[in-house]
Amino acid sequence: MKILGISGSLRKGSHNTAALRAASEVAPDGVTIEIADISQIPLYNDDVRAQGYPPAVAHFREQIRAADALLFATAEYNYSISGVLKNAIDWASRPPEAPLTGKPAAVMGASMGLFGAARAQYHLRQIGVFLDLKFVNKPEVMIGTAQERFDAEGKLIHDPTRELIRKLVVSLVEWTALLKR
């Protein structure tokens, strides 16, 4: 099974991207997690889209299409998802053949505060309703005080968080298999 990881942070030392790497490390046998690079996706402009998808957007849409499921790791800015993640979602949600439609998905988030991007995760789930994303409900992975759970190189050093991420990936794999029946 192929899962596409999408980080809502472009920061080099992003805890959310590090959480996706940790998910890849704990994924069950036969499951791969590729992390999308959304850094080159331009700001959404329907005039541009009308002339054809820019190469970075076309590549991202194809990555989504080729994936069996999506795993979002969202940062939280002003009680919501990051602008870069919303922008990538906007590009991926457009016709023709919007690749997000009906896609199994899971969400987790990391923050340096206590709440682990909880509000951003709930907001992403709301956006997902309109897009017909099929989100896993449990477990919820809210990685608060992320600076204490990852080392300076971005490696997850907190075993309970690693186990929670593993459970989320397993749940996503099972959910995806159920939806494909």
What do these predicted ranges mean?
Residues 1-30:
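N-terminal beta1-alpha1 ligand-phosphate binding loop
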Residues 4, 45, 134-181:
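Glycine-rich phosphate/pyrophosphate-binding loop and the adjoining helix
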Residues 3, 16, 20, 57, ...:
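A general structural signal for well-ordered alpha-helical segments in protein cores
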Residues 38-54:
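N-terminal beta-loop-helix "entrance" segment that forms/cooperates
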Residues 6-7, 36, 108:
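Short hydrophobic segments within beta-strands
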Residues 28-34, 133-134:
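A generic structural motif
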Residues 52-132:
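Helix-loop-strand module that forms the ligand-binding subsite of alpha/beta enzymes
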